[in-house]
């Protein structure tokens, strides 16, 4: 991948692993676990709002690369950049402020709807494994009946 003139930025480990696997399956690009952990080709921002602190890395250290930015279109309960349109606007406004044009953005899960990489993964699960989600959904329903209990994050389900 070192000869490909792109660098990828994403929100978290799940996104990073998904993108690594996608590149391997569809483009035969191998990224080792070590390179993934060291953010060599796919930069794990750890949070969408940390993108705004990446100016030096994106426009100076990676000036010869095109930046591909993958962010979740979280709902309004999760973030102030809620939804597809606000996520696109957030990235475009930031890149405009930096006067940076060598980028593209893809909003997960499908570049049109609100959601996360976990929503995408849930929708593409092998039908043989659907029983696991049915069981998990019952578990969440049971927990939701008691307000003193916390329902696990969707990342736990996936």
PLM regions and their residue ranges:
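Catalytic nucleophile-elbow at a beta strand-turn-alpha helix junction centered on a G-D-S/GDSL motif
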Residues: 6-17
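C-terminal accessory helical subdomains adjacent to catalytic cores in phosphodiester-
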Residues: 3, 20-38, 48-158
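Short glycine-rich substrate-engagement loop in P-loop NTPases that contacts/grips substrate
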Residues: 44-46
């Amino acid at each position: 991948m070192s000869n490909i003139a792109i660098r990828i930025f994403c929100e978290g480990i799940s996104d990073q692993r998904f993108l690594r696997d996608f590149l391997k399956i569809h483009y035969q690009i191998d990224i080792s676990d070590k390179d993934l952990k060291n953010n060599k080709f796919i930069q794990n921002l750890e949070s969408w709002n940390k993108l705004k602190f990446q100016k030096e890395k994106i426009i100076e250290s990676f000036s010869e690369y095109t930046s591909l930015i993958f962010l979740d279109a979280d709902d309004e309960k999760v973030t102030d950049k809620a939804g597809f349109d606000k996520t696109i606007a957030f990235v475009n406004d930031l890149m405009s402020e930096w006067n940076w044009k060598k980028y593209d953005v893809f909003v997960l899960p499908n570049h049109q709807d609100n959601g996360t990489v976990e929503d995408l993964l849930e929708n593409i699960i092998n039908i043989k494994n659907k029983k696991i989600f049915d069981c998990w959904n019952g578990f969440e329903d049971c927990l939701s009946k008691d307000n003193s209990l916390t329902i696990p994050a969707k990342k736990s389900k996936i």
